[in-house]
Amino acid sequence: MIIYPTMELQNGRCVTLERGRLDAPMLWHVDPFETVSGWASAGAEWMHLTDLDAVAGTSGNAELVEQIIRKAEIPVQLAGGMRSRERIEHWIDKGAGRIVIGTLAARDPELVKELAKRHPDQIVLSVDVWQGHVMTDGWRSQSAYTPEAFIDAFADVPFAAIVVTDIDSDVEEVEAKLGLISGLAAHSRTPVIASGVVRGADDISRLAYVPNIAGALVGRALFRKSLSLEDALSIAASAHERVAQFQ
C-alpha cells in the first residue's frame, strides 16, 4: 500500500479543508518546498497535490504547482480543476506523474476514456461520495451517478487508480468511511486509493488489510503531527509484508 503525503494549496499557502469547504480553510504555516523535500527524504514514493484555486476556477497557484512538480524528488499526483483536455495535457507536459479527474468524467466520460487510453497509468478517477451520489465541481454539485454506477461506467478503462472520498461521514467517523471505501474497493477492478480516512497509525493498519486498497492519501494527520510520515510508511510496508505471507 502506497502512502501519498498530501498537500492542498490555496492562495499559495498550505491548507486543509473541512468537508471541502473552500471558505473555511485551516492554514498551516509551512514552506511547501521544504515540506515536499522532507517527504522525499522520509522515503515517500509519491505525493498528492490538490490545487484548490483551480477547483474554484482560478489560476493563482499555477506557477507554484509547476515549481513543486519540477523540484519534487518524487512523482506528483495532481488534482484540482482538471475539466478539459487542454488542462490535463498541459499538466502532463509539465511533468505531473498522474492527473486526477472527477467532474470531467461525469460530464464527458468518453473524453476521459480516450485520455486514459492515450496516457496509460497517468489518469486517476476521483469518486467523491455524498448521500449515495457522486459529487462534482469541488463537492458543490450532485450528479445522477451512484458511486457503483460511476465505477462501472469506466470498468475497462486503464486508470492508474481510483481515489474514493466519503464526504458524508464526519472527519472522526472513520468506521463509516471505511465501510463505504471497502465496499467500493470490492466493487472495483481498478486499485483504490482511500482519501479522508487516516487520522493516525491504527487507520493505516486497518486499511492495509482491505482487499484492493492500493494506497491512502494522508494530509491533515501529517500537518497536525498526529502521525509522522516515517511511521506511516513503516506501518504500510510491514502490513503489506504480513498480508503477502497469508496469500
From Swiss-Prot:
- Where in or outside the cell? Cytoplasm
Q: Is Isomerase a UniProt keyword of this protein?
A: yes
Q: Which UniProt keywords apply?
A: Amino-acid biosynthesis, Cytoplasm, Histidine biosynthesis, Isomerase
- Top EC group: isomerase
Q: Example GO molecular function term?
A: 1-(5-phosphoribosyl)-5-[(5-phosphoribosylamino)methylideneamino]imidazole-4-carboxamide isomerase activity
Pathways involved: Amino-acid biosynthesis; L-histidine biosynthesis; L-histidine from 5-phospho-alpha-D-ribose 1-diphosphate: step 4/9
User: Which GO cellular component term is one of those annotated?
Assistant: cytoplasm
- One Pfam family, short name: His_biosynth
Give me any GO biological process, just one.
L-tryptophan biosynthetic process
Presence of the UniProt keyword rRNA-binding in the record: no
Give the superkingdom in one word: Bacteria
Q: Which reaction does it catalyse?
A: 1-(5-phospho-beta-D-ribosyl)-5-[(5-phospho-beta-D-ribosylamino)methylideneamino]imidazole-4-carboxamide = 5-[(5-phospho-1-deoxy-D-ribulos-1-ylimino)methylamino]-1-(5-phospho-beta-D-ribosyl)imidazole-4-carboxamide
The UniProt record lists the EC number as 5.3.1.16
InterPro entries, alphabetized: Aldolase_TIM, His_biosynth, Isoase_HisA-like, Isoase_HisA-like_bact, RibuloseP-bd_barrel
Task: Give the main localization category.
Answer: cytoplasm
Active site, renumbered: E8 (proton acceptor), D128 (proton donor)
Q: Give the matching HAMAP family.
A: HisA
Q: Give the record's family classification.
A: Belongs to the HisA/HisF family.
> What is the name attached to this protein's record?
1-(5-phosphoribosyl)-5-[(5-phosphoribosylamino)methylideneamino] imidazole-4-carboxamide isomerase 2
